[in-house]
């Protein structure tokens, strides 16, 4: 293992700390709820869902966090302004944790930013994400909101190399007038969480691991990803899924360890149902990493799996 020469930022999001040197803080884990075709969702457009089942899933994640010491956030996914509003209200009611607001639609993300500001929850919200598709209206909505935490996505549709992704953050890579980090500054983002972006296996998925290290070395911001998207988009693995669902689940969940070993600070681990497996696995990695850097003058915080489970 290693220690970064660059001072590493530690972001504080509603009491949850993320970032720092490898082995210093436990990995922050975020499970996704209300995702596409989630069985608990009854009407994705209106945001109708089985409330009892949803609360059990949130509690499952919180239980994993209580057991291992790994902090957690709830990754909310919505496709319409109506649905994401209902989802935010529900998560705020049943949990005190920070939450990510995510949608494939920019106007929906912008609406969510305004809504959490209106109801006084902006300090708990993480915008997901500032990316190369951001336009003027979305920037304006984010700038006018009270949100100060956001994921900055390093996806570059023209150049998925390490250089292309880094340039997207720093300069806009010739596709934007300025880099995404600069845009984040203009939008009032203090807590910048860098996500290198996960492309399919065979199309540069592993570059995200290298970029995690490169980004932390260059800027010092907390960095992580939704690395499970690599195995979940793996054609070979998907062909095995019907024959052996356990094999699929092992690869999907196991990818968590790869991101942690590459100095990841946070992980969007996919379906929140996987919490009962992800938290012990992430805790195991955190313990081993903390032990690996013990002689590098890196001391784990009190609330760390090494102090909970060893």
Curated annotation (Swiss-Prot):
InterPro entries, per the entry: Dihydropteroate_synth-like_sf, MeTrfase_MtrH/MtxH, MtrH
GO biological process: methylation; one-carbon metabolic process
Keywords linked to the UniProt accession: Methyltransferase, Transferase
Keyword Phosphoprotein (UniProt): no
Keyword Methyltransferase attached: yes
Protein family according to the UniProt entry: Belongs to the MtrH family.
Assembly notes: May be part of a complex composed of 3 subunits; MtxA, MtxH and MtxX.
Signal peptide as annotated in the record: none
EC number assigned by the record: 2.1.1.-
Name recorded for this polypeptide: Putative methyltransferase mtx subunit H
Pfam family, one: MtrH
Gene name in the database record: mtxH
Annotated GO MF terms: methyltransferase activity
């Amino acid at each position: 293992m290693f220690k970064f020469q660059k001072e590493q930022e530690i972001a504080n999001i509603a009491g949850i700390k993320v970032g720092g040197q490898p082995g210093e803080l436990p990995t922050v884990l975020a499970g996704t709820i209300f995702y596409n075709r989630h069985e608990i969702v009854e009407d994705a457009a209106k945001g109708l869902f089985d409330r009892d089942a949803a609360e059990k899933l949130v509690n499952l994640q919180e239980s994993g966090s209580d057991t291992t010491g790994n902090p957690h956030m709830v990754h909310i996914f919505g496709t319409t302004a109506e649905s994401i509003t209902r989802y935010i209200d529900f998560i705020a009611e049943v949990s005190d944790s920070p939450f990510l607001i995510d949608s494939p639609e920019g106007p929906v993300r912008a609406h969510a930013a305004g809504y959490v500001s209106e109801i006084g929850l902006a300090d708990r919200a993480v915008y997901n994400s500032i990316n190369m598709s951001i336009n003027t209206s979305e920037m304006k909505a984010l700038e006018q909101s009270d949100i100060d935490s956001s994921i900055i996505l390093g996806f570059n549709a023209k150049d998925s190399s390490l250089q292309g992704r880094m340039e997207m953050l720093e300069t806009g890579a010739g596709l934007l007038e300025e880099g995404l980090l600069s845009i984040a500054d203009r939008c009032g983002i203090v807590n910048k969480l860098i996500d290198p972006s996960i492309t399919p296996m065979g199309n540069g998925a592993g570059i995200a691991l290298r970029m995690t290290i490169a980004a932390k070395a260059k800027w010092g911001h907390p960095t992580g990803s939704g690395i499970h998207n690599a195995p979940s988009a793996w054609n070979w693995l998907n062909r095995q899924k019907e024959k052996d669902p356990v094999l699929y689940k092992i690869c999907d969940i196991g990818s968590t360890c790869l991101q942690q070993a590459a100095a990841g600070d946070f992980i969007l681990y996919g379906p929140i149902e996987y919490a009962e497996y992800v938290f012990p696995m992430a805790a195991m990695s955190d313990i081993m990493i903390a032990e690996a850097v013990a002689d590098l003058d890196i001391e784990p915080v009190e609330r760390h799996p090494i102090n909970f489970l060893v």
